[in-house]
Structure formats: structure tokens, C-alpha cells
């Protein structure tokens, strides 16, 4: 590898909007993110399942379809 052409690799403190902090390696010293594994619905178990069958029935009833 040639010297002085690669970016500096430093510890990066990542801050989430929910207040969670963790450290990773990156080219930037700080990152701010909107969502992380502590507040994402998939990881927290509060994931909502949308019931589309009710919407389909309502649409069919509205337009008198079978």
C-alpha cells in the first residue's frame, strides 16, 4: 500500500435520535443517525402487522365488486 493516500481510520461515536451511543471504526469521528437497533420496531418487538384484507373488502364493497 502506498503511504499518505488512505483516509485516517478512527473510532467513531455513533449517536441515535433515541439517545443510544456506540462506537465503531470509520473515517469520521462522529455520526448522528435517526434509528438504531434499540429503537427500530423490528428489533424492539413492537412491529405492527397491517391487515390489508379489511382494506380490500372495503374497496370491493365501495365499488360493488365480487
Swiss-Prot record:
It comes from the Bacteria. Binds 1 zinc ion per subunit. Pfam families: Ribosomal_L31. InterPro entries: Ribosomal_bL28/bL31-like_sf (IPR034704), Ribosomal_bL31 (IPR002150), Ribosomal_bL31_A (IPR027491), Ribosomal_bL31_sf (IPR042105). GO terms for molecular function: metal ion binding; rRNA binding; structural constituent of ribosome. One of its GO terms (cellular component) is ribonucleoprotein complex. Signal peptide: none annotated. Its cofactor is Zn(2+). Zn(2+) binds at residues 16, 18, 36, 39. SUPFAM superfamilies: L28p-like. GO terms for biological process: translation. Keywords: Metal-binding, Ribonucleoprotein, Ribosomal protein, RNA-binding, rRNA-binding, Zinc. Binds the 23S rRNA. Part of the 50S ribosomal subunit. Belongs to the bacterial ribosomal protein bL31 family. Type A subfamily. This is Large ribosomal subunit protein bL31. It comes from Nitratiruptor sp. (strain SB155-2). The lineage of its organism: Bacteria, Pseudomonadati, Campylobacterota, Epsilonproteobacteria, Nautiliales.
Amino acid at each position: 500500500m502506498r503511504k499518505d493516500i488512505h483516509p485516517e481510520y478512527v473510532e467513531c461515536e455513533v449517536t441515535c435520535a433515541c439517545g443510544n451511543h456506540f462506537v465503531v471504526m470509520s473515517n469520521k469521528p462522529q455520526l448522528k443517525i435517526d434509528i438504531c437497533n434499540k429503537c427500530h420496531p423490528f428489533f424492539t418487538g413492537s412491529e405492527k402487522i397491517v391487515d390489508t384484507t379489511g382494506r380490500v373488502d372495503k374497496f370491493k364493497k365501495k365499488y360493488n365488486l365480487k
